[in-house]
Structures are given as C-alpha cells and as structure tokens.
Curated annotation (Swiss-Prot):
Pfam families from the UniProt entry: NBP1
Post-translational modification: Phosphorylated by CLB3-CDK1 in metaphase which is required for correct localization at the nuclear envelop and the spindle pole body, and dephosphorylated by CDC14 in early anaphase.
Motif segment (CDC14-binding): 200-202
Region (Disordered): 142-221
Membrane topology: Peripheral membrane protein
Protein name (database record): CDC5 pindle pole body anchor protein 1
Motif (CDC5-binding): 165-170
Domains (record comment): The PxxPxF motif called the CLB3-docking motif mediates CLB3-specific phosphorylation.
GO BP: any one term: positive regulation of protein localization to spindle pole body
Quaternary data: Interacts with CDC5 and CDC14.
Gene from which the chain derives: CSA1
Span of the annotated motif CLB3-docking: 189-195
Length: 221
C-alpha cells in the first residue's frame, strides 16, 4: 500500500508501515466472547420463561380462588405459556414425556375396563341372590368333614407267587449272548412222558333229550 503524491510533474510514492497482528488469537478471543454471550442470553431466556410461567400459573390460581373464574379460562391462559416453555426443554425430555403420557392413557383404559368388569360381576352376583353367609357355612362344613375323616386302611400286601421257570428260561426272554452260550441240547423239548397223552380228545357234553318238557323253550313253528 502506498500514497501517491503529484507535485509539479514529479510523482512520489510514500509507503505506509503495516504492523502485523495476531489474527488467530483475536479470532479465538472473539469466538469465546460470543459463545459466553450466547450462553448467558440462553440462561436468561430460560429463567425468564420459567419465571413468567410460574407467575402466570399463580395468577390464574389466585383469580380462580378470588373471582371464581372457571377452569377452562385458567387452562386457556396456561396452555400457550407451556407451549412457549417447551422450546427450552431438551428433546429427550419431550420424548420421555410423550411416552409417559401414552402409558398413562393405556393404564386409564385398562382401569376403566377392569371397573366395568367388576361392575358386571357384581350385578351377576346380585341377580343370583346368593347369600354369602350360606357359602361360608358350606365351606366350613366341608372343612370339618375333611378333618373328621378316618384314615384309609392300608391294603394287604400282594401275595408272593413263585416264578414259573418255563417262562423265565424260554429263549424269547434271553439275551442274544446268553442264547449263544446255551447248548443246543437245552433248546430241544424234554424227554419223558407225553403231556398231551392224558387228553387224547376233547371232552364231550351231554346230549339233550328229544322229548320237550314244560321247562324247555317251545319250538318255533
């Protein structure tokens, strides 16, 4: 940079001395001051919002108590302030508040359903006209009967019978290892008197008499 001077056809140029500045330091300092100012402003605004909201709420309560203003007017005066105050509330709190409100709505529905169910059951009991004292007395009688019951007698022991060796020694009930170790002679039928020789034929029944009697059934014609 320089300043040009014209005097009588002579052109002179005078240079100005430029002092170097610490630009980075100045920038950081300005940014810090700005951030501090923004923080202070945001804190002040939040305090003002909260203070104004509390004042409006207390004023609405005083008006409702003194002049007897209805609750609708009080709600109308409070709602816009609460909307303005939502700007200061973090987003996480808003999401949590919405979730809690939804849970409250669902629990209110469940409570209403349970109340209606209890009311219906009570009406059914009233229609049946059941005496509670009668039920209690019957319950007490059943308990007394159970307490006075005699203990059941123990069953006699089952008779002990000898095991049939023919069944236990049959090759069907033996393992394959035992059947291999058993000699072939043991599998053959025992030698001795024939068991079926005692019964050469089936026993015969007595033949009915051909002459009908009074006790006999009449023949069908």
């Amino acid at each position: 940079m320089g300043i040009q001077e014209k005097t009588l056809g002579i052109r002179k140029e005078r240079k100005l001395v430029v002092v170097p500045r610490e630009r980075n330091h100045v920038r950081h300092a300005s940014q810090r001051t700005r951030s501090k100012n923004y923080k202070n402003i945001s804190k002040k605004r939040a305090q003002q919002h909260a203070f104004g909201f509390n004042i409006a709420k207390t004023l609405a309560k005083i008006q409702a108590f003194v002049w007897g203003s209805p609750a609708d007017e009080e709600e109308e005066s409070v709602v816009p302030l609460s909307k303005n105050s939502q700007d200061c509330v973090p987003l996480q709190w808003q999401a949590k508040f919405a979730q809690l409100r939804q849970q409250l709505h669902s629990t209110q529905k469940e409570l209403q359903f349970v109340k209606e169910k209890c009311h219906l059951l009570q009406s059914v009991l009233d229609d049946a006209n059941i005496d509670q004292r009668y039920l209690e007395s019957r319950r007490d009688m059943k308990n007394i009967e159970r307490d006075n019951l005699k203990p059941t007698e123990n069953l006699p022991p089952s008779p002990v019978r000898a095991v049939n060796p023919l069944v236990t020694s049959s090759p069907i009930h033996m393992s394959p290892l035992q059947s291999r170790q058993r000699p072939v002679s043991s599998l053959q039928p025992p030698k001795g008197p024939n068991f079926y020789a005692k019964y050469p034929k089936l026993p015969q029944t007595n033949i009915l008499r051909e002459s009908p009697t009074e006790d006999s059934v009449p023949h069908a014609e």
